[in-house]
Each structure stands twice: as C-alpha cells, then as structure tokens.
Amino acid sequence: MTGIYDNKLTSGLEGKPKLIRLLETLRDHATATNLKWAEKLGINPSKSITCVKPEGTTSCLVDSASGLHPRYADYYYRRIRIDKKDPTYNLMKDQGVPCEDDVINPGNTAVFTFAMKAPKGTITTEDLRALDHLDLWKTYQEHY
C-alpha cells in the first residue's frame, strides 16, 4: 500500500475506528486469498501478506504520496541522477529539463531537476506532528 496520506480514510482523518476496520478487512481478505491460492497451487501459504511499500520512483509516476509518508511540501524540487550514456539523458537535456553535472561523478552522471506541485489540500510534513505520524504507523503495524 502506498499514498496513504493522499486519502482521508487511509490517513486516519476520518477517524481511527474507520481506519482500523478498513485495515483489518483488507488484511483478512488478503490472507484468505493467499490461503485459497496456496491450497490450489499446492504450496505453503505466505507468512507475510500485507506491507506498506516504502516507495520512491513509482509514487512519482502515479503522483501519490510515498508509502506511509506525507508529501514534503506544497511545492518542492525532485532531483534524479542519470548516467550520461542513457538515452533518457539526451532526451531530457534536448527537451530543456534543468540539468547539471553530478558533484561526485561529473563525467558520467547528470542530475535533472523537476519542479513539483502537490495536489490541493495535500497533507505535508509541516501539517503533521511526529507523534501523530508514529501513531498512524503503529495502527498499520497492529491492524494491517
């Protein structure tokens, strides 16, 4: 699961009881499905079924918050490193994407910078107290 803070229910904003009910329903369904298919395939069922994906690039591709983390800010820069031999390097450079040489490996690696805007109403790191974030993490650990 990822993009948790992009959804009022999965972020706990609609109340902890609703979130717990959702997480336990999802967990139970995933566990039952795992048992069903393990039996059909004649294999042992998985010991670990559910997870919160830590995320990175995929969340950028689908424009979601990353894993169990809120978005950084309403506006921020996303930077990626690309080998200068990669065809994507020339494509992005030719399209005018801001680019600079990597400090550690300037001869072989480039750093591209993208300006990012979070969706309106997004929960950001400034909106979230650390203890509330830990409490949500604990809820996921206990019920998912």
Spans of features found by a protein language model:
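Internal maturation/activation junctions in enzymes
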Residues: 3, 8-54
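Catalytic alpha/beta core of large soluble enzyme barrels
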Residues: 54, 61-144
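Short capping micro-motif at the N-terminus of alpha-helices
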Residues: 47, 60-61
